[in-house]
Amino acid sequence: MGPYLSQPKTEKSTVTGQNQVFQYAATHMQGWRNTMEDAHISDMNIEPDVHLFAVFDGHGGSEVAIFAERHFREELMKNKNYQQKNYEKALTETFFKIDKMLQEPSGQDELNKIRGVNDETSLAGCTANVALIVGKTLYVANAGDSRSFLNRDGKPFDMSKDHKPDDDQEKKRIERAGGFVSDGRANGNLSLSRALGDLEYKKDSRFKPEEQIISALPDVKVTQLTASDKFLLMGCDGVFETWDHQQILNFVNQELKSSQNLQKATEKLLDQLLAKDTSLGTGCDNMTCILVLFK
């Protein structure tokens, strides 16, 4: 059996919310894939004026993405740097904490329960694109190839960059750790170079966690939100295969002008991005999109 269904699953699950500062919609759709491996967080007011959104795109299974969805908020809020308002450092440390939890027996037990198996080591992983809004400051921590961008004065302002094995910096780390890059893939397998999980690439005790073949180290980008920022859009890589950021921005703008309904906007966007068939391979992935509209 190949990776695709004979017909796409186009049913969508959407959650919405709003407060005095923004409203949001988070939508996911399985699409052509045999399984749904995405997970996400949409959590307003984890504290007064602090909000958390995240996209986790799983590979090799859904269990690591689901684990991150379950635990990221709690681990972030327990972090001492978070409590001291050192948010950049707190986000980075939480990525590594989740990765460490995955390696512990209790973490493996939970992964096995998610998968419905016993006594196996999970080889799955996931991207993590995490947005923390604190007042008027936006922090985005990213590991992998899920993305976030702002609509800033009608133009996309990227809040993350993809981590790919053939990028010079990534390739050097992979090779220093004893790995190799072939056909744009780490060890000829993974098409991204940073992720949560993927524990088989993180076993060498000679190297720090950030030095392993696959690293959980996120890039963290920070910006101050102003009146020129209309919305934040986050998504797994399946959202960005068909259209570029400007095309997505224009489509969302047009939908919001006509309906002011975020759920309609995100659901129609995924319909537009879904491939008609699987012949080209693009537009065939699971899709998760979070739209945060600032008031």
Curated annotation (Swiss-Prot):
Its EC number is 3.1.3.16. GO terms for molecular function: metal ion binding; protein serine/threonine phosphatase activity. Mn(2+) 1 binds at residues 57-58. Mn(2+) 2 binds at residues 57, 237, 285. It comes from the Eukaryota. Residues 151-170 are annotated as: Disordered. Enzyme with a broad specificity. This is Probable protein phosphatase 2C 5. It comes from Paramecium tetraurelia.
